[in-house]
Structure formats: structure tokens, C-alpha cells
From Swiss-Prot:
Together with its co-chaperonin GroES, plays an essential role in assisting protein folding. The GroEL-GroES system forms a nano-cage that allows encapsulation of the non-native substrate proteins and provides a physical environment optimized to promote and accelerate protein folding. This is Chaperonin GroEL 2. Forms a cylinder of 14 subunits composed of two heptameric rings stacked back-to-back. Interacts with the co-chaperonin GroES. It catalyses: ATP + H2O + a folded polypeptide = ADP + phosphate + an unfolded polypeptide. One of its GO terms (cellular component) is cytoplasm. It is found in: Cytoplasm. It comes from the Bacteria. ATP binds at T29, L30, G31, P32, D86, G87, T88, T89, T90, G418, N482, A483, A484, D498. Keywords: ATP-binding, Chaperone, Cytoplasm, Isomerase, Nucleotide-binding. NCBIfam families: GroEL (TIGR02348), PRK00013.1 (NF000592), PRK12849.1 (NF009487), PRK12850.1 (NF009488), PRK12851.1 (NF009489). It is an enzyme of class 5 (isomerase).
């Protein structure tokens, strides 16, 4: 395909125009009085949202240079969302401010490489100051406040905080997995799973012990884990007899249990001779093997597998795991208080953490995170309902962002919200970090841009942006504008805070993309295809001659 090329100022201005188009659409959503944006869908109802990254993803521009500029800023929003789960609009506003000031100076004759160096040094200094001023999250109320701001609903913030403590047994669990699911009811409900749950239920309904609730409850059972299929009862019989002598029930988790092995277990359960439940192992391939190994470590058992030289015929009671209780429904199985060795469980948890850090796939990371939570505490499910499909989609997305926001707060701490932390961190850039020339210009550009998020929040709240920024810059650290009420308060005390991870990620990603914009000397884009010629004799009625 033929290409078109733009150089110097033309190239940079084309990119900037695309950036501004996207940023102007996104920044109206910033702050407690931010507006919504309606996104048309190719099918179904439109989406109404105030989530920066969702809006950015939908914007496709026609001009090839503008399109590239918009794509670069989308990357800022996406990267910030991936790292911190929030702060996408703040990152976009910062990027726009940095690029606008930077291009003005480049057009006036400044050296882009000098400005880039100044921006990088200033960003590193401000990041350092933000991390130093961050306060550790210590209470459920602080998490509720942070998540509530992100979700724009204090009640949702409270549910998220409750979930993070519930899966840790009353303590804050940093590894907690909180999933958000759609519900047919109105409002937001929290469901906490104690222990390890996986989404496979009993193979036969005859295994149920509670016919009203259609679930099988096994108290203090033995747990048999098998990596292959079980179909021959002769293989299983010696082990079944040993378990029967103990008077304990048995949970069998295998790739499948079928044929005479399954029918024998069912018949013994119906007669009341022996209580057991057979369940298919979750997952496929290597992921199934890994989950079986997790269960083995959690319950103190050994996976019966030919790979390690173990077979069902020779299996003995010491190879079986134990748990205080197992609850099996038609859809899922929950193992409560497995009898595994705590040192081995900790070792497995650390191994999974390392795998998460080394994984490049978002999907793999998500699955590893779920395994980690099941081993180290439990899983909470927030069920969300709404009156319409549009509202449900928007609400679910907000809650998912708020969950990630709360986790970011627990990870690195919190700073004053409302754009105040960035503005007040600008004091570390006094004297231009003792730099000179274009590097000092780069520092000035960052110092100026740090007020942009606060100014936009004030603007969206109908206030005079310059006046607000000037007043906040003279207030004590941590005090600033509560845009919801228009009052100047101690933001941390009022529960208006942001995770420092969100704030620093927004600045770092915005600075990174701004440096790329300023040092761009040429843009190569696909040449637009010429429009197809009209059909001969076509008229206004669609070219069909009607």
C-alpha cells in the first residue's frame, strides 16, 4: 500500500490535532461533576460511560496523521488502566498539557532532546515525592473511600472494602480476588466463598446429601486426586475399602469418573453404605495439572499420576488429602480448611506470584491471580444489577475499575485526591532542579502540566480553573478542593484520596508519550484509498435509478 509522509512541524501538529480530539472527548468525564459520553455501538443499545479508557478505545479518526496521534494517547490510557485500573482520564489530561506546552517550545526553537531529558528528570523527581508522601492504607474505611470515589458511589466502595476483608478472614488480604458478575436483581450484593472453590460440580445428582439445596456436604472427608480417568472399579476398590474402614466420606477429583466405577459409587451412596462424591477436575491440559497440584498442596495429598509413578491400585491413605468440610453443588465445589502444610502452601503462593510477574499474557495473569487467591484466602463475588442493559454495563464497568483502584491503594498507599497531590508535588521542581537551557524548559513544562488535572476537575464543576489552582497551591499539604461541594478541606480526612500507584502511573505514562511526540521528526502513514466512483446514471436514491 502507498504511504504518505509528513515532516517536522507538519508531522507534530497532525499528531497533536488527533491527541486533542481524543483528549477533549475524554477529559469532560474527570472529577465528581464530570459528564458522561455516549458511545454508539454497531448493534444493540449505545453505552453511556465516564470511563476514560472505554471512550478512548471507541475513537477512530479519519485523517491518517490525526489517527496516529489519537492511537498514541490511547496507549497512555490503556497502559495506565492495565497497571493501576484507573487514572486513564488523568493520564490523558496530563499528556495533552505536556504535549501542548512542549510543542509550543519546540516551535519557538528549543531542542526537543533537551526538553525530553528535562521532562524525564522532572517526572522521576515528582514520582519520588508522591511515593514519599503516600500513606499506607490501614482501615476498611480508607479502602471504602478510595473505591467509592472511583465508582462514584460510596455504597459500592463499602462493598468492595468488605469483600477485601472478608476473603482474608477479617484481615486485609492483598491477594484477594474479587470478581464482578451481572445479576437479575437490583442493587449490589456481596457473596464470599470461604476456602477454595472451582467451577465443577458433582458428576451425578445422586451424590447430593441435601435434596432441598441439591448439594453434597462432606464433613472431615478424605480427598483423592487423580490426573486421569477412572472407569475400572477394580483399580479403585482396594482404596475404597481402606477409606470405608475409617468411617469417613471420600471426595474424588479426577479427569472423569465413568462406567462401573461411577455406578458402584452411586449405588453405595444410595444404599447408605458409603458416602462419596465424584467431581471432574477443573481446566484443561497444563492448567488442569497445575490446579490439581494446588489442591494437593492445600489438602496435604499427592496427585495420583503415572508421571510420578503412582497408580490407584497401590494408593494408600497417606496419599489422600483432608479438609474440614467440602460442599459440592451441581455447578461448583468448595474445599474449606484443607489440611496442607502451611510452609508448602506459602512456597506455592510465592511460585505463582513469580509466574504472574513473568507472564506477558493478561489472560494468564488473571488465571494465575485466581489460583493465588484460592490458595491464600478465598474469592468474593460482587453481583450487580440495574434497571436497563445500558445501565448494567456501565455500572459493572465502574465497579471493576473501583476494585482495581482499591487493590492499587493497598499495594502502594494513598495520596490526596482531586489532582491536589500532583499540584502540590510541583514544589520539588523549584529552581528547575538546577538545570539550564532546554532541560530547564522541560522541567518547567512538567511543573505547569501538574496543575492540569485539578484545573479540569474545577472546570467540570463549573468553577474558575486558574483561581482554584492558585488557591490550592498556597494551601497546606493535603488540603484542596472538594469539587462535589465546592469547599476547600483536608482531603485525606474527608476521604478524598487516590492510590499513589494510579497518580504516578498517570504521570509516568503521560510523560513517556509526550517525550515521543516532541522528538518526532517524521510520520509515515497509509495513503487513504480514493473514494469509489459513483455508478453511471446514479441519482440521489442510492444509485438504483428509482
Amino acid at each position: 500500500m502507498a504511504k504518505i509522509i509528513a515532516f517536522d512541524e507538519e508531522a507534530r501538529r497532525g499528531l497533536e490535532k488527533g491527541l486533542n480530539t481524543l483528549a477533549d472527548a475524554v477529559k469532560v468525564t474527570l472529577g465528581p461533576k464530570g459528564r458522561n459520553v455516549v458511545l454508539e455501538k454497531s448493534w444493540g443499545a449505545p453505552t453511556i460511560t465516564n470511563d476514560g479508557v472505554s471512550i478512548a478505545r471507541e475513537i477512530e479518526l479519519e485523517d491518517p496523521y490525526e489517527k496516529i496521534g489519537a492511537e498514541l494517547v490511547k496507549e497512555v490510557a490503556k497502559k495506565t488502566d492495565d497497571v493501576a485500573g484507573d487514572g486513564t482520564t488523568t493520564a490523558t489530561v496530563l499528556a495533552q498539557a505536556l504535549v501542548r506546552e512542549g510543542l509550543r517550545n519546540v516551535a519557538a526553537g528549543s531542542n526537543p532532546m533537551g526538553i525530553k531529558r528535562g521532562i524525564e528528570l522532572a517526572t522521576a523527581k515528582v514520582t519520588e515525592a508522591l511515593l514519599a508522601s503516600a500513606k499506607e492504607v490501614e482501615t476498611e474505611e480508607q479502602i471504602a473511600a478510595t473505591a467509592g470515589i472511583s465508582a462514584a458511589d460510596p455504597a459500592i466502595g463499602e462493598q468492595i472494602a468488605k469483600a477485601m476483608y472478608a476473603v482474608g478472614g477479617g484481615k486485609l488480604n492483598k491477594e484477594s480476588v474479587i470478581t464482578v458478575e451481572e445479576s437479575n436483581t437490583f442493587g449490589v450484593d456481596l457473596e464470599v466463598t470461604e476456602g477454595m472453590r472451582f467451577d465443577k460440580g458433582y458428576i451425578s445428582g445422586y451424590f447430593a446429601t441435601d435434596m432441598e439445596r441439591l448439594e453434597a456436604v462432606l464433613e472431615d472427608p478424605y480427598i483423592l486426586l487423580v490426573s486421569g480417568k477412572i472407569s475400572n472399579i477394580k483399580e479403585l476398590l482396594p482404596l475404597l475399602e481402606k477409606v470405608m474402614q475409617t468411617g469417613k466420606p471420600l471426595l474424588i477429583i479426577a479427569e472423569d469418573v465413568e462406567g462401573e466405577a461411577l455406578s458402584t459409587l452411586v449405588v453405595n451412596k444410595i444404599r447408605g453404605t458409603f458416602k462419596s462424591v465424584a467431581v471432574k477436575a477443573p481446566g484443561f491440559g497444563d492448567r488442569r495439572k497445575a490446579q490439581l497440584q494446588d489442591m494437593a498442596i492445600l489438602t496435604g495429598s499427592q496427585v495420583i499420576s503415572e508421571e510420578v509413578g503412582l497408580s490407584l491400585e497401590t494408593a494408600d491413605l497417606p496419599l489422600l488429602g483432608r479438609a474440614r468440610k467440602v460442599v459440592v453443588t451441581k455447578d461448583d465445589t468448595t474445599i474449606v480448611e484443607g489440611a496442607g502444610d502451611s510452609a508448602q502452601i506459602d512456597g506455592r503462593v510465592n511460585q505463582i506470584r513469580t509466574e504472574i510477574e513473568n507472564s506477558d499474557s493478561e489472560y494468564d495473569r488473571e488465571k494465575l491471580q485466581e489460583r493465588l487467591a484460592k490458595l491464600s484466602g478465598g474469592v468474593a463475588v460482587i453481583k450487580v444489577g440495574a434497571a436497563t442493559e445500558v445501565e448494567l454495563t456501565e455500572r459493572k464497568h465502574r465497579i471493576e475499575d473501583a476494585v482495581r483502584n482499591a487493590k492499587a491503594a493497598v499495594e502502594e498507599g494513598i495520596v490526596a485526591g482531586g489532582g491536589v497531590a500532583l499540584l502540590q508535588a510541583a514544589h520539588v521542581l523549584a529552581n528547575d532542579l538546577d538545570l539550564t537551557g532546554d532541560e530547564a524548559t522541560g522541567v518547567k513544562i512538567v511543573r505547569e502540566a501538574l496543575s492540569a488535572p485539578l484545573k479540569q476537575i474545577a472546570l467540570n464543576a463549573g468553577l474558575e480553573a486558574g483561581v482554584v489552582a492558585d488557591k490550592v497551591s498556597h494551601l497546606p499539604a493535603g488540603e484542596g478542593l472538594n469539587a462535589a461541594t465546592g469547599e476547600y478541606v483536608d482531603l485525606m480526612a474527608a476521604g478524598i484520596n487516590d492510590p499513589v500507584k494510579v497518580t504516578r502511573s498517570a504521570l509516568q505514562n503521560a510523560a513517556s508519550i509526550a517525550a515521543l511526540f516532541l522528538t518526532t521528526e517524521a510520520v509515515v502513514a497509509d495513503k487513504p484509498e480514493p473514494a469509489a466512483p459513483a455508478m453511471p446514471g446514479a441519482d440521489e436514491m442510492g444509485g438504483m435509478g428509482f
